[in-house]
């Protein structure tokens, strides 16, 4: 089981601080004892507490696209991610992790 925290900033409001994300993650640490991370920008804040199942060492979240324009947190399991990944690799996608979450990001 994992935990996700998030906040979307209304137009004209101040950007959220990463410290707020860390405090939000602290509340849900019991949901994901293995790893945690925070993304904060001027529009949103995403927090993730992870129970590592797939790519235990390399599946840190939030996960970013190669150009850092897209960020994802994901709680779930893609059972056919290896098949999907193989198809994406055939189409030229390059993966940085072994995580099923990155398959979503690359698709």
Language model features: what each stretch is:
Residues 1-107:
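N-terminus-centric sequence/structural signature that marks the extreme N-terminus
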């Amino acid at each position: 089981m994992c935990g996700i925290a998030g906040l979307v900033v209304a137009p004209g409001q101040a950007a959220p601080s990463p410290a707020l994300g860390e405090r939000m993650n602290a509340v849900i640490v019991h949901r994901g004892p293995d790893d945690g991370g925070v993304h904060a920008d001027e529009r949103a804040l995403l927090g993730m507490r992870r129970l590592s199942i797939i790519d235990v060492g390399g599946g840190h979240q939030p996960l970013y696209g190669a150009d850092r324009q897209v960020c994802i947190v994901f709680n779930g399991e893609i059972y056919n991610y290896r098949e999907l990944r193989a198809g994406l690799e055939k189409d030229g996608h390059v993966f940085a992790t072994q995580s099923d979450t990155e398959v979503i990001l690359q698709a």
